[in-house]
A protein has these predicted regions:
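Nucleotide/phosphate-binding catalytic cleft detector across ATP-hydrolyzing
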Residues: 1-71, 79-198, 205-252
Length: 252
């Protein structure tokens, strides 16, 4: 009988997989086993903030400390990196997916309008904001959904200030994670961060006014990295292509 099962990966292939810094040993083992079952001969793991830093062009092997915040879909990763290691870190399960849920719940609560997660995502993209005052605000956005009172289709206009209100608690949680990571950062690295500032990566970094809000609470410069959506993927690819250079940054 012909075996119709085929591995997705050639047996000799090495694989570098990005994982959250707050992952448990059980979760880490599950990731590794999944890769091995897929056919990977050698599996390396790299933490998301480390990959984001590499993909953002930060010299992670340098002695100077750099802080990066990677706001992805499921988690927000905050890390201070120096000499190829993570000196301090904080991971919270508040990121893009949670922001979408916040918007969906806000629409139900404040407007009696039921919307789906894809619609919430579009609201976030079009009028999402972390602050209630923007110098260059986006135009109001028309939202379509189901009226919870009458059960019929309905549309309303929503502005960025409403979205900022909807996201406030989740943004607070991200700010708390940043402050916690800063509070346990060694003094020498804190001095470096004071000079270089904080780097923002991931899809959440594109939320309007988030950089200003983090700047306000930390009193540090905040920079959105170039092409933040691909920073983690780009950094993981760079680590894979340069395993000799970045071997110490990955784990078996």
């Amino acid at each position: 009988m012909t075996n119709t099962k085929h591995s997705l990966i050639t047996p000799a292939m090495k694989m570098v997989i990005c994982i959250p810094s707050g992952i448990t040993e059980v979760e880490e083992r599950a990731v590794r086993e999944s890769a091995e079952q897929a056919g990977a001969k050698e599996v390396r793991l790299i933490y998301e903030p480390m990959a984001a830093a590499i993909g953002s062009g930060i010299d992670v092997l340098d002695a100077n400390g750099n802080m990066i915040i990677d706001i992805g879909g499921g988690t927000s990763e905050v890390a201070v990196i120096a000499l190829g290691s993570i000196a301090s870190k904080k991971s919270v399960q508040v990121a893009g997916d949670r922001l979408n849920t916040d918007i969906k719940e806000f629409m139900r609560r404040e407007h009696n309008l039921d919307i789906g997660i894809p619609t919430a995502e579009q609201i976030k993209i079009n009028v999402g904001a972390a602050v209630t005052h923007l110098d260059n605000p986006p135009a109001d956005y028309e939202v379509y959904g189901r009226d919870l009172v009458h059960g019929i289709p309905r549309s309303i206009m929503i502005n960025y200030q409403e979205v900022a209100t909807a996201l406030n608690n989740s943004i607070n949680a991200i700010e708390d994670a940043v402050m916690q990571a800063l509070n346990v950062t060694p003094p020498e690295l804190s001095a470096d961060i004071f000079k270089t500032g904080i780097y923002l990566a991931g899809s959440g970094s594109l939320l309007r006014g988030l950089d200003k809000r983090i700047n306000k609470i930390t009193q540090l410069p905040v920079h959105v990295v170039e092409d933040p959506l691909r920073a983690v993927a780009r950094g993981t690819a760079i680590a894979l292509k340069n395993l000799d250079k970045f071997e110490s940054l990955t784990k078996y």
